[in-house]
């Protein structure tokens, strides 16, 4: 928890956030977040969506993997990369990219919440990353669309929403350069695992199955949604890595330009046949 002295310092810089805060360390960065204890509903359960600025400590593993994937991708390119995180919350993911990955040229982090953008900007300054990280306060799709023009596109876009990423996929693929890497998180596992199948069909364009391997199906539904969305822009995808962890699924896919690439992605889509009488 912040001491009274630190709170006074924050106020002196015009950074009285209007809610209780505390310092957290993750990876190589130290940053301010809403006080987690305030939003606990039990000894083990924390509700990040109830906080004025989003931060989920359970997703640290997600961010750890993202750092490793982006570093490997940057090394495979052999040049500096430009990164965008359009739904940043407190800013920790984007700041970690800048602080922990060699070869990052620029990181643009954004949140539509003024409180989140304000806190993220403070965290960028606290970690001495203002030379690499810029903070934007606008709608995520508007931000991504502004970078959809040639020579403005990113090498890596990380979409990590609270819920489904489908609302941002169209803008995200357009904001990526040829061969760029798109990372998607989906936490709406109830539709994806068949509890609400109609919602899944509406969002992802596929029907889920309530089976013991429903999380694998969820990843494939997300990949299929990405493939069809990218194909509308004559882009194909190549899934490089995915995982299902705790309450979410995660997908990393390379986006390649060209109608042939799009056709190849669509041809890889198919159907799963499952007999509930046999299994």
Residue ranges and their predicted role:
Residues 1-279:
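SAM-dependent transferase fold signal centered on methyltransferase-like domains
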């Amino acid at each position: 928890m912040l001491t009274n002295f630190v709170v006074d310092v924050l106020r002196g810089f015009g950074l009285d956030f209007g809610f209780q805060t505390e310092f957290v360390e993750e990876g190589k960065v130290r940053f301010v977040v809403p006080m987690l204890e305030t939003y606990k509903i039990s000894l083990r359960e924390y509700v990040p969506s109830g906080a004025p600025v989003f931060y989920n400590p359970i997703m640290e593993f997600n961010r750890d993997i993202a750092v490793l994937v982006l570093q490997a991708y940057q090394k495979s390119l052999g040049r500096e990369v430009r990164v965008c995180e359009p739904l940043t919350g407190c800013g920790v993911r984007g700041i970690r990219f800048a602080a922990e990955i060699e070869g990052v040229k620029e990181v643009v982090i954004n949140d539509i919440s003024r409180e989140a953008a304000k806190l993220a900007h403070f965290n960028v300054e606290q970690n001495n990353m203002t030379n690499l990280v810029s903070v934007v306060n606008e709608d995520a799709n508007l931000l991504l669309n502004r970078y959809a023009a040639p020579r403005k596109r990113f090498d890596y876009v990380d979409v990590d929403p609270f819920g489904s990423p489908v609302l941002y996929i169209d803008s995200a693929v357009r904001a990526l350069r040829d061969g760029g890497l798109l990372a998607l998180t989906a936490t709406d596992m109830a539709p994806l695992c068949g509890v609400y199948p109609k919602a899944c069909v509406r969002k992802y364009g596929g029907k889920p199955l309530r089976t013991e391997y429903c999380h694998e199906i969820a990843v494939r539904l997300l990949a299929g949604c990405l493939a069809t969305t990218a194909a509308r822009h004559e882009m194909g995808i190549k899934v490089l890595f995915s995982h299902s962890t705790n309450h979410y699924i995660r997908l990393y896919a390379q986006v390649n330009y060209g109608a042939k690439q799009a056709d190849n992605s669509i041809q890889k889509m198919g159907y799963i046949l499952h007999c509930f009488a046999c299994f």
